[in-house]
């Protein structure tokens, strides 16, 4: 009888231990990502150990986003909040205050070398907390447009997940390493595509100045009527100045962005005689069935659109 009772107790301990381990694994980290690019990075690093909520969704504009009550609830429940920083998310502090979140807020641009930006079109740089509207130098927050910086984001995410979930650290590090290899391959493809474009043709127009890091890293020149934020419209004088500059610099292609109204770009295309070459993904990924539903797909789409519009292929 005693032997049977001991055996039963032992089985109970084993069952409870297994159940406890299963329950612990069944509770993924609750992660809030400020926008879709970060959410994609987090998914690749975290796998099934993380449950991700994205604040600014596909084709959304983080510069002008207004948080919802559901966003505040998600923030309040989060273990980790992943943000870009560099004043990209103008809504962030309001959302943190409204949610009273206790989550760790991880700024993924830590370790990135920021690019300072002096707007050529002074009326269009009034980003919340970033631009001044007076033509002064501001910090460009779009660091993720450099694949080298994307690797830094991924490293920071893996470190944050390891700190919050030490049991999953090996998994996070393995996933991050595998994804980084994909980014390495992507960067090679982007550089090869740019090299195939004659230097004299490497001038393009987009809606707002979201591609400064891409320009710095890969050697294209981007012109835009709006500054680093989309939260203000350029003046007629700004548009006229850009049209004149386009004629002087002989831009090779013009593109709309997925997050902006195409009206202004269509106007500039009409006045310069340059055909709109397609859509570039700047501050957000596409819908799941679109051509830029992941970061890697976004970069493939953008370089394919640019190369195709300039070279006619």
Question: Where are the language model's segments positioned?
Answer:
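Extracytoplasmic metal-acquisition and chelation regions
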Residues: 25-313
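Bacterial N-terminal signal peptides
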Residues: 7-20
């Amino acid at each position: 009888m005693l032997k049977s009772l001991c055996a039963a107790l032992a089985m109970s301990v084993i069952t409870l231990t297994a159940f406890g381990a299963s329950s612990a694994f069944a509770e993924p980290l609750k992660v809030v990502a400020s926008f879709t690019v970060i959410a994609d990075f987090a998914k690749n690093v975290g796998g099934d150990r993380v449950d991700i909520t994205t604040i600014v969704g596909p084709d959304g504009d983080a510069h002008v986003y207004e948080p919802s009550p559901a966003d505040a609830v998600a923030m309040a429940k989060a273990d980790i909040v992943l943000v870009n920083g560099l004043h990209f998310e103008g809504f962030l502090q309001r959302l943190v205050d409204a949610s009273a979140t206790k989550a760790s807020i991880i700024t993924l641009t830590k370790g990135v070398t920021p690019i300072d930006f002096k707007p050529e079109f002074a009326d269009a740089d009034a980003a919340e907390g970033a631009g001044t509207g007076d033509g002064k130098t501001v910090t460009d927050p779009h660091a993720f447009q450099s694949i080298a910086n994307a690797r830094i984001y991924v490293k920071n995410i893996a470190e944050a997940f390891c700190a919050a979930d030490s049991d999953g650290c090996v998994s996070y590090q393995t996933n991050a390493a595998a994804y980084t290899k994909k980014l390495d391959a992507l960067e090679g493809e982007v550089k090869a595509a740019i090299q195939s474009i004659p230097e004299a043709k490497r001038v393009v127009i987009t809606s707002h100045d979201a591609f400064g890091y891409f320009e710095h890293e890969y050697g294209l020149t981007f012109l835009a009527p709006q500054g680093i934020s989309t939260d203000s419209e350029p003046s007629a004088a700004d548009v006229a100045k850009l049209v004149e500059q386009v004629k002087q610099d002989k831009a090779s292609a013009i593109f709309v962005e997925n997050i902006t109204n195409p009206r202004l770009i269509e106007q500039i295309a009409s006045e310069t005689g340059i055909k709109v070459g397609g859509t570039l993904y700047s501050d957000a990924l596409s819908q799941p069935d679109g051509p830029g539903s992941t970061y890697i797909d976004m970069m493939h789409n953008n370089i394919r659109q640019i190369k195709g519009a300039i070279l006619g292929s």
